[in-house]
C-alpha cells in the first residue's frame, strides 16, 4: 500500500512547496491565505474559570470574542489595545485561559472525552491538547449532569475525575508540558517519557480514547512561522510519514475495543495525512471503522464539516487507483477554508482486538500515597489555617521528594509499567522541620475556597507584587497568606511583622519586568 500511494501521487518538482497542491485547491488563494497573519484565539480553562466569567471579563477589557465553531470554550480574540501581549496577560499567566490556535482545538473536540475515562495523549508536548482534555474530564458529573454528556464513559465505574496519560520523548518539551499542566491546575494527568511505539506492547487496550497529534512537516503553520516551509523536502515528508504510521498503529493497539482514536497533523501533505490513515485502514480493515466528524463532535455544535470533508475526498481520489474509490469523511482544513492553520484530522473506532494483550510488568511509583496519618495532619492544618482542606472527593495526596502532590485518584491508581515522569500539581511543600507550606499552584487553583488567611489586594499592592516587591500589610496578618484580587487567586505570600514577603511564581512576577 505504501508503494502504491507514492506512485499514484507523484507531482512534478515544485518551485514552491504548495505548487504540488494545484490539483487540489486554488494555489493563489492558498498562498494568499498563508501569507496573512494568523487570527489570535484562546481556550477558556474551565478548571479555573467559567466561560461566562471569561466572557464578562473580556468585555471589561474591550475584547471582541467570536466563538470557535468546533469547541465551546474556544474564542477568536480581537483587541484594540495591543500594548500588552496576549501571552503576558495576568489571567493567561494564571491559567484561566490558554493561547491555542483554533484548528488545534479540533482533535480533542473529535475525541470528545468524558469524565471518568482513561485517555492517552501519545505526542503530548507542549500541552495544548493535554490541558484541553484535562479540563473536559475534570468536569464532574455533578457539574455537567450525565444527561449533558453525548456519551457515557466506556469505563465501568461512574463518571468521576478521569486520567490522562500525557507522553512525549524530549526532555525540554516535557518541562514545557509540565509547566503548562501546573499552571492550568490539571490534577488528572500523569506524564510519561517513552517512544510512542512503546504503548503498542506495554499498554495494549488500556485507553478509552487516544489522540495521536503526530510530529509532522508542519506546513500548515506557515501563517505564524514562514520558516516552516523549509522542512518540506520529499525526504522529510516520507520520513515523517513512516513515523506517523508507526505512531498511529501504536495508538490503535493502545485503545480499548470500542475506543476512539483521533489522528491529526498540522501539515498539508497527502503522504502524512490521508496517505497514513488509508494505509492503516488497509492493514486493519476488519478492526477499524471511520467515524463521521458530525457523530464525533460534542453535542450542540452546528459546525458545517462538508467543505473540509470534500477537500479531503479530492486528495483521497488522487491516492486511489480505483475509478470509484471508497472515500472516507476525513477533515482537511486548508488555511483559506476556515481562516485557520492548515490541519488534518481523522476519527477511527476500534471494533476488534488488533494484538494480544500481554501481562503488565509493574514498576514502583515515584510518587507514593501519603500515609493516612500525614494526610489527616495536612488536612487539619489547612482547615485550621484557611478554612478548607482544598480537597475534592475523587482526589488524593501523594508524596514525592519534599513535596506533597494533589492528584486524581484514577491518575495515581492507573497501572503503569514505567516510573512516571510527573503527576498532578504541587499541593504543599514539606519544610526541613516537618511543617507543610501551601504552594502557589494550589492557591491559584483552589484559593477562592479559602475563608481565612486571605489578603484581598488593592491595585497598588498588586502592582508592587507583580514587580517582585514585598509589600506592607496589617501586622495582625501572620503566616502563609493567599493573595486574591477581584476574586482571582494569584498565589501565596508570607506575612511577617507587618510585611508580606512576595512568594508569587516566576511566571506571574515577570509581568512587572
Go through each PLM region and give its residues:
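S-adenosyl-L-methionine
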Residues: 169-202
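Conserved AdoMet
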Residues: 43-105
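Helix-to-beta-strand junctions that scaffold the AdoMet/dcAdoMet cofactor pocket
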Residues: 255-256
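Conserved class I S-adenosyl-L-methionine
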Residues: 116-123
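C-terminal catalytic and target-recognition region of SAM-dependent MTase-like enzymes
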Residues: 70, 267-399, 491, 506
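Mobile active-site "lid"/loop adjacent to the S-adenosyl-L-methionine
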Residues: 145, 172, 208-250, 262, ...
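Polybasic, low-complexity RNA-engagement segments
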Residues: 8-24, 30-61, 341-344, 351-513
Amino acid at each position: 500500500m505504501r508503494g502504491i500511494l507514492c506512485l499514484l501521487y507523484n507531482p512534478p518538482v515544485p518551485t514552491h512547496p504548495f505548487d504540488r497542491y494545484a490539483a487540489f485547491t486554488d494555489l493563489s488563494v492558498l498562498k494568499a491565505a498563508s501569507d496573512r497573519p494568523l487570527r489570535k484565539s484562546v481556550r477558556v480553562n474551565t478548571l479555573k474559570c467559567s466561560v461566562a466569567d471569561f466572557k464578562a471579563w473580556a468585555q471589561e477589557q474591550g475584547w471582541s470574542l467570536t466563538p470557535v465553531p468546533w469547541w465551546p470554550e474556544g474564542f477568536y480574540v480581537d483587541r484594540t489595545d495591543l500594548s500588552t501581549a496576549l501571552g503576558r496577560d495576568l489571567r493567561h499567566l494564571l491559567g484561566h485561559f490558554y493561547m491555542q490556535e483554533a484548528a488545534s482545538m479540533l482533535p480533542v473536540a473529535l475525541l470528545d472525552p468524558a469524565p471518568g475515562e482513561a485517555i492517552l495523549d501519545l505526542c503530548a508536548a507542549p500541552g495544548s491538547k493535554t490541558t484541553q482534555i484535562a479540563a473536559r474530564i475534570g468536569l464532574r458529573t455533578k457539574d455537567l449532569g450525565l444527561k449533558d454528556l453525548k456519551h457515557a464513559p466506556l469505563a465501568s465505574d461512574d463518571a468521576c475525575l478521569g486520567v490522562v496519560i500525557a507522553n512525549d520523548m524530549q526532555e525540554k518539551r516535557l518541562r514545557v508540558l509540565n509547566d503548562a499542566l501546573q499552571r492550568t491546575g490539571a490534577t488528572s494527568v500523569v506524564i510519561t517519557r517513552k517512544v510512542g511505539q512503546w504503548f503498542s506492547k506495554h499498554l495494549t487496550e488500556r485507553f478509552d480514547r487516544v489522540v495521536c497529534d503526530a510530529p509532522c512537516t508542519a506546513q500548515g503553520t506557515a501563517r505564524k512561522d514562514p520558516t516552516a516551509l523549509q522542512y518540506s523536502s520529499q525526504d522529510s515528508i516520507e520520513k515523517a510519514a513512516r513515523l506517523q504510521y508507526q505512531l498511529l498503529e501504536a495508538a490503535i493497539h493502545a485503545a480499548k475495543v470500542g475506543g476512539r482514536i483521533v489522528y491529526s497533523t498540522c501539515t498539508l501533505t497527502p503522504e502524512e495525512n490521508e496517505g497514513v490513515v488509508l494505509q492503516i485502514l488497509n492493514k486493519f480493515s476488519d478492526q477499524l471503522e471511520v467515524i463521521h466528524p458530525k457523530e464525533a463532535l460534542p453535542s450542540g455544535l452546528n459546525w458545517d464539516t462538508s467543505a473540509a470533508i470534500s477537500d479531503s475526498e479530492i486528495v483521497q481520489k488522487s491516492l486511489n487507483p480505483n475509478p470509484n474509490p471508497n472515500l472516507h469523511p476525513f477533515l482537511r482544513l486548508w488555511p483559506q477554508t476556515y481562516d485557520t492553520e492548515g490541519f488534518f484530522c481523522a476519527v477511527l473506532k476500534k471494533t476488534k482486538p488488533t494484538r494480544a494483550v500481554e501481562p503488565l510488568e509493574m514498576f514502583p511509583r515515584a510518587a507514593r500515597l501519603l500515609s493516612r496519618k500525614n494526610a489527616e495532619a495536612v488536612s487539619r492544618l489547612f482547615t485550621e489555617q484557611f478554612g478548607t482542606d482544598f480537597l475534592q472527593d475523587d482526589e488524593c495526596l501523594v508524596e514525592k521528594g519534599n513535596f506533597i502532590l494533589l492528584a486524581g485518584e484514577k491518575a495515581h491508581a492507573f497501572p503503569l509499567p514505567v516510573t512516571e515522569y510527573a503527576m498532578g500539581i504541587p499541593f504543599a511543600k514539606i519544610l526541613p522541620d516537618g511543617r507543610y507550606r501551601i504552594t502557589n499552584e494550589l492557591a491559584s487553583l483552589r484559593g477562592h475556597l479559602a475563608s481565612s488567611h486571605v489578603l484581598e489586594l488593592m491595585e497598588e499592592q498588586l502592582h508592587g507584587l507583580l514587580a517582585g516587591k514585598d509589600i506592607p500589610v496589617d501586622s495582625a496578618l501572620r503566616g502563609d497568606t493567599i493573595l486574591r484580587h477581584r476574586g482571582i487567586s494569584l498565589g501565596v505570600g508570607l506575612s511577617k511583622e507587618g510585611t508580606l514577603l512576595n512568594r508569587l511564581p516566576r511566571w506571574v512576577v515577570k509581568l512587572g519586568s
